[in-house]
From Swiss-Prot:
Source organism of the structure: Dictyostelium discoideum
Function comment: TFIIF is a general transcription initiation factor that binds to RNA polymerase II and helps to recruit it to the initiation complex in collaboration with TFIIB.
Protein name according to UniProt: General transcription factor IIF subunit 2
Subunit structure: Heterodimer of an alpha and a beta subunit.
InterPro entries given in the database record: TFIIF_beta, TFIIF_beta_HTH, TFIIF_beta_N, TFIIF_interaction, WH-like_DNA-bd_sf, WH_DNA-bd_sf
């Protein structure tokens, strides 16, 4: 784009690519982080094998492939458009989203199992910080002089609520994360599962009630474990391998 044409677009929207059809693919956090580490260049490839059989492979050395679950964008689905902005602030309409895709994760793949184990280890490792204090900074007691006491007012401020809201994942994706967590440990508390799945507490508890038992007494008090029907199902998958 020439400088003359670019200057004319400042404050306006370039619609040259308005008719382009664009795909919108929702990816999990670990995949997004992997792409960010790659930096510039190719981050993956889309493989169209016919019909709805579409997959995504990423990273030159990873060699992992994900199936894509597609949803056609219709007038009933609020239509979305893609915009871009260059360093000079010029806006451009890059196209319309014609297809929405969600990644279907193979929870039985070795790569995904290794990822879940590393996340589980990370969230269950307590870190402590050691700080060296200079002796000159230590408290030195002084004589108390009541005449030098100054009266001041104290205000109480309400603690700001965290704005870092966790994004709700679809139930099937959360279930995959829950089953993966219980492959590493048979009993887990809510805090660990909440950190592991990165889901809002109430949303997670609703799903846990469907597949888990919360022990209310005994040595596993306040710990979750899979219900027998899901535990046996998960074990049978491992035995087939």
């Amino acid at each position: 784009m020439s400088e003359e044409k670019n200057d004319a677009l400042v404050g306006e929207v370039n619609t040259d690519n308005a008719d382009n059809q664009v795909w919108l693919i929702k990816v999990p956090k670990f995949l997004s982080e992997s792409w960010q580490k790659i930096g510039q260049g190719e981050i993956g490839q889309i493989h169209i094998k016919g019909g709805d059989n579409i997959s995504l492979s990423y990273g030159p050395d990873v060699g992992q492939e994900f199936q894509l679950i597609t949803t056609a964008n219709t007038l009933d689905n609020q239509p979305l458009k893609i915009f871009s902005e260059d360093k000079d602030g010029a806006l451009a309409l890059e196209g319309n989203i014609g297809l929405r895709c969600d990644i279907k994760i193979d929870v039985e793949s070795p790569q995904y199992r290794d990822l879940m184990k590393s996340r589980h280890t990370k969230y269950n490792t307590k870190t402590r910080m050691t700080q060296v204090i200079d002796e000159s900074e230590l408290f030195t007691p002084t004589l108390f002089d009541a005449n030098k006491v100054k009266v001041s007012t104290v205000g109480i401020t309400q603690k700001k609520k965290s704005t870092d809201k966790k994004e709700k994942l679809p139930e099937d994706e959360v279930l995959d994360l829950i089953f993966s967590a219980f492959r590493a440990e048979k009993h887990l508390d809510l805090k660990t599962l909440e950190s592991f799945t990165e889901q809002p507490k109430n949303h997670l508890k609703t799903i846990l009630e469907k597949v888990c038992i919360l022990n209310k007494r005994g040595p596993y008090h306040h710990l979750y474990e899979l219900k027998p029907e899901f535990r046996d199902k998960d074990n049978s998958k491992d035995e087939k391998k």
